């Protein structure tokens, strides 16, 4: 019975920590550039695009495809950075918990 109470207490503490971590992640931002800094993308912690900067030299009709590729590359890099930061925070929160390999938390 004591073990069950201890597990319930741990679960409640984990829930509070997860909420705090989710709030912290929501305020995070990740930025990445491509094309030597010609395009910069910033994503919020929720994964939404919050800023896009494009060097005016790319605003030429014959360079549309290059611009599109640079935006996609910068976005993908920013997303990878954001996911890495989220994974790091999640790992620090769940350290020491008996979570099965491959189990994904719901956030």
UniProtKB/Swiss-Prot annotation:
Subunit structure, as described in the record: Homodimer.
GO cellular component terms attached to this protein's record: bacterial nucleoid; cytosol
Pfam family, one: YbaB_DNA_bd
Keyword vocabulary terms for this entry: Cytoplasm, DNA-binding
NCBIfam families (alphabetical): DNA_YbaB_EbfC
Protein name: Nucleoid-associated protein BCAN_A0034
Domain of life assignment: Bacteria
Compartments where located: Cytoplasm, Nucleoid
Family listed: Belongs to the YbaB/EbfC family.
GO molecular-function terms, A-Z: DNA binding
Role noted for this protein: Binds to DNA and alters its conformation. May be involved in regulation of gene expression, nucleoid organization and DNA protection.
